[in-house]
Curated annotation (Swiss-Prot):
Coiled coil: none annotated. Residues 105-155, 230-254, 343-371 are cytoplasmic. Its main location: mitochondrion. It comes from Homo sapiens (Human). This is Mitochondrial carrier homolog 1. GO terms for molecular function: membrane insertase activity. The gene is MTCH1. The chain crosses the membrane at residues 94-104, 156-176, 210-229, 255-279, 323-342, 372-389. The modification Omega-N-methylarginine is found at R29. Belongs to the mitochondrial carrier (TC 2.A.29) family. Residues 1-93, 177-209, 280-322 are mitochondrial intermembrane. The lineage of its organism: Eukaryota, Metazoa, Chordata, Craniata, Vertebrata. Keywords: Apoptosis, Membrane, Methylation, Mitochondrion, Mitochondrion outer membrane, Repeat, Transmembrane, Transmembrane helix, Transport.
Length: 389
């Protein structure tokens, strides 16, 4: 995957984007009934409880607890919490960087090692390209272990900027309080909630993507210098100067449109699919205790099984939709390095593309729209062509 996070691996991406997908929590029917009864008499609704499913004691909402900030932290601890998020994100980014590095080199078509003959599950002879581990060993042989972390600095800065941007936006534009609904009878209300949540998440993702994309471009170009052994982009500040001098301001945003489209399609596809599956296929009345005895003895456990299923639904939908939107990621990364003076962005590795649509059509004709999506079992396709060193 080239990068995204704002680049993240599919499983991480699915978890982040699916926040709204299963936001429809359980128990809407009982809650709605209690609300109607409470409006007709005293005491207020907050003090009424469903006869079968007692309502827990009222807790302050997330917005009230953090003073309406809606950010990563709450109160005086917000800066510390946000710094912790940035630090954790930096650790994950550093650990996953070799994976992203190898993936990007495969995306641009750099195959320094010849394929090997193997057999598939049907026993047929096929040609396999080197796996991620073999490719990583090759990089270590050429550049040493430190070579696996080429381009890490701008990527760390990109992800940190994205995290801080999202946290700041939550403080400036705090999300509305979320009421959990999931019953089929409340489908219209639930769908409106999912649409509202997804729109909010889309706004944050698009803004953070646009602000962090220049650093993403620099990181991509630093990594693909491995192909031609160049040293054109050696630091963040010097890279900014080179890009601005050679390509102008637009040079920092090449490949942005396909990345934005991929993010938008992913968010809406993942959240809506998860919502409809959870609303129509997940039964809130299923108890996780035999015979349903747990409903009265432990009311809080009634919906634990349904909530667990919903969490798995979000995860699975995130992986499935991320696979479908992978071509947007590939095209965005290829455009970021295309015709920038590096060998990886010029023939024979890649033609000079006029636009990202031109790049998409070219990859589609070549059957390469999913190039780099698999890092373990990589078969040589009929339309593939790779360079040998």
């Amino acid at each position: 995957m080239g990068a995204s996070d704002p680049e993240v691996a599919p499983w991480a991406r699915g978890g982040a984007a699916g926040m709204a997908g299963a936001g429809a929590g359980a128990g809407a029917r009982g809650g709605a009934a209690a609300g109607v009864e409470a409006r007709a008499r005293d005491p207020p609704p907050a003090h009424r409880a469903h006869p079968r499913h007692p309502r827990p004691a009222a807790q302050p909402s997330a917005r009230r607890m953090d003073g309406g900030s809606g950010g990563l932290g709450s109160g005086d601890n917000a800066p510390t919490t946000e710094a912790l998020f940035v630090a954790l994100g930096a650790g994950v980014t550093a650990l996953s960087h070799p994976l992203l590095y190898v993936k990007l080199l495969i995306q641009v078509g750099h195959e320094p090692m010849p394929p090997t003959l193997g057999t598939n599950v049907l026993g047929r002879k096929v040609l396999y390209l080197p796996s991620f581990f073999t490719y990583a060993k090759y990089i270590v042989q050429v550049d040493g272990k430190i070579g696996l972390f080429r381009g890490l600095s701008p990527r760390l800065m990109s992800n940190a900027l994205s995290t801080v941007t999202r946290g700041s936006m939550k403080k400036v534009f705090p999300p509305d309080e979320i009421e959990q609904v999931s019953n089929k009878d409340d489908m219209k209300t639930s769908l409106k909630k999912v649409v509202k949540e997804t729109s909010y998440e889309m706004m944050m993702q698009c803004v953070s993507r646009m602000l962090a994309h220049p650093l993403h471009v620099i990181s991509m170009r630093c990594m693909v210098q491995f192909v031609g052994r160049e040293a054109k982009y050696s630091g963040v500040l010097s890279s900014i100067g080179k890009i601005f001098k050679e390509e102008g301001l637009l040079g920092f945003f090449v490949g942005l449109i396909p990345h934005l489209l991929g993010d938008v399609v992913f968010l809406w596809g993942c959240n809506l699919l998860a919502h409809f599956i959870n609303a129509y296929l997940v039964d809130d009345s299923v108890s996780d205790t035999p015979g349903g005895l747990g409903n009265d003895q432990n009311p809080g456990s009634q919906f634990s099984q349904a909530l667990a299923i919903r969490s798995y639904t979000k995860f699975v939908m995130g992986i499935a939709v991320s696979m479908l939107t992978y071509p947007f990621l590939l095209v965005g990364d290829l455009m970021a390095v295309n015709n920038c003076g590096l060998q990886a962005g010029l023939p024979p590795y890649s033609p000079v593309f006029k636009s990202w649509i031109h790049c998409w059509k070219y990859l589609s004709v070549q059957g390469q729209l999913f190039r780099g999506s698999s890092l373990l079992f990589r078969r040589v396709s009929s339309g593939s062509c790779f360079a040998l060193e």
